[in-house]
Amino acid sequence: VWIERYLSVSYPLHRMKINSLYGYRKDPFTGKKKFHNGIDLHARGDEVMAMMAGVVVKVGQDKSSGKYVTLRHGDYTVSYCHLSRILTRKGAAIGPRDVVGITGSTGRSTGEHLHISCKLDGKSVDPLMVLDYIKSIREECVAALAESREAPALSPAGGKHR
């Protein structure tokens, strides 16, 4: 059960380094204070993985997001933006760790990175909530597995196995 739960989530990149947080910040193009609707992760030609099981609801390209993929995970949608390549298609069923694209610097971008934006019931939310959820599941599972290895095995009669 714990291994299945651990495998039910994934970080979007093999190495995680946050360059820019969700919320108001100085716009790198204008220098003015502007709302940043996601987080930016450091990346260099990295595979972008789905964080949970879901369905690809949109793939496309625009001036702002560049090449992007949007996945639906229940009430959440997660968009991965500024990709150099899209490696999935609309309607595809996706599992955690499935590669959906390669990081890049397409669209309104100052350099290569992965921009992740999340919506809950259509409203923008901080993607760190999803990353914190993934971290908590992984920590819970690792702790439970470690505890199960430390517990002495009991025989049906209640004694320890030898």
Name these PLM-found stretches:
Residues 1-14:
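Long amphipathic alpha-helical scaffold segments
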Residues 11-150, 154, 161-162:
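Catalytic cores of peptidoglycan-degrading enzymes
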